């Protein structure tokens, strides 16, 4: 099979897998699984994660997530991370005068943001108005800063994205900025390569986004008598900080195991929402593991 045919085959598979995962967004409680791929090898994987019942919830449940990275040639790639699909459109090489592009990636992002419905443990939240699935389209960019040493995986990746709802679930933009440090341990488990990562990120959102997910108004006011009938309309801005960590152990030439987690602390009006203060928790966790196959 020619390289072109292989690329086309895996591209079709990537789109199919991406659509399947994104169409299931209504069941997912987190829009972004805390896994960041450290390199650009062709890969397919699957994992299970404990995620909050809804954004700001106290209770958790298990969900599955799929992963896929397909190289399209000359540094272009398509990547699926749970409910997030990314297409890098920056070529890896465009001539000797632009070698620095090998550390820069940018392109388009499509994300499914989950619904909030009656499938939660909290009895009050079960009776609140249902929030439909939101789909988001936007852009992303990242820069990889090599760290001292000869190992290409020893680096800091600075990244950011901005997206807008495509189905009028909310208005205004949401965005992330983050830095992730990757460290290849000199001695791994059983002599196998071991890669660790830790990051820090900020999540920003619009007024309408926070009002949509954290606001209390309309018929929901009767469920929160402490508000005295006064709607709670949170403002946007800095909504949370996010701290992801992961460990990836190579199991063989084609297999690896990743254990990952993320702590998220809701801030400002999001943390002050009665939905979070009385029915949930401002401390949000995502924990899980995934098995990956490189091809």
Residue ranges, per PLM feature:
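Cleavable N-terminal export/targeting peptides
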Residues: 1-41
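Short loop/turn motifs that connect adjacent beta-strands in outer-membrane beta-barrel proteins
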Residues: 30-41, 75-103, 146-155, 169-171, ...
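Outer-membrane beta-barrel transmembrane domain signature
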Residues: 31, 145-149, 163-258, 264-271, ...
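Transmembrane beta-strands of outer-membrane beta-barrel proteins
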Residues: 40-46, 66, 78, 104-108, ...
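Transmembrane beta-strand segments that form the barrel wall of outer-membrane beta-barrel proteins
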Residues: 44-52, 76-86, 122-126, 154-166
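Solvent-exposed loop/turn segments connecting transmembrane beta-strands
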Residues: 53-62, 89, 131-134, 163-174
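Outer-membrane beta-barrel "beta-signal"
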Residues: 65-67, 281-295
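Transmembrane beta-barrel domains of outer membrane proteins
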Residues: 69-71, 86-90, 97-98, 140-146, ...
């Amino acid at each position: 099979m020619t390289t072109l045919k292989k690329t086309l085959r895996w591209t079709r598979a990537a789109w199919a897998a991406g659509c399947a995962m994104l169409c299931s967004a209504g069941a997912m409680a987190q829009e972004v699984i805390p896994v960041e791929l450290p390199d650009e090898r062709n890969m397919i994987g699957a994992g299970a994660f404990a995620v909050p019942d809804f954004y700001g919830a106290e209770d958790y449940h298990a969900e599955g997530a799929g992963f896929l990275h397909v190289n399209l040639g000359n540094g272009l790639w398509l990547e699926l991370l749970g409910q997030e699909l990314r297409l890098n459109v920056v070529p890896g090489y465009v001539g000797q005068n632009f070698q620095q592009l090998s550390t820069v990636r940018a392109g388009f992002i499509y994300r499914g943001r989950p619904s909030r419905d009656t499938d939660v443990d909290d009895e009050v939240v079960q009776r609140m108005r249902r929030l439909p699935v939101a789909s988001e389209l936007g852009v992303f960019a990242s820069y990889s800063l090599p760290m001292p040493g000869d190992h290409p995986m020893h680096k800091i990746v600075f990244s950011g994205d901005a997206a807008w709802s495509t189905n009028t679930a909310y208005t205004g933009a949401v965005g992330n900025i983050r830095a992730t440090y990757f460290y290849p341990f000199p001695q791994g488990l059983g002599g196998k390569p071991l890669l660790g990562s830790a990051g820090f990120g900020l999540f920003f959102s619009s007024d309408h986004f926070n009002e949509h997910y954290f606001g209390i108004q309309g018929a929901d006011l009767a469920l929160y008598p402490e508000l005295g009938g006064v709607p709670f309309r949170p403002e946007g801005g800095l909504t949370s900080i996010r701290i992801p960590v992961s460990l990836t152990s190579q199991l063989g030439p084609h297999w690896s195991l990743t254990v990952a987690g993320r702590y998220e602390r809701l801030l400002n009006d999001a943390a002050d929402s009665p939905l979070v203060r009385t029915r949930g928790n401002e401390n949000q966790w995502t924990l899980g593991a995934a098995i990956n196959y490189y091809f």
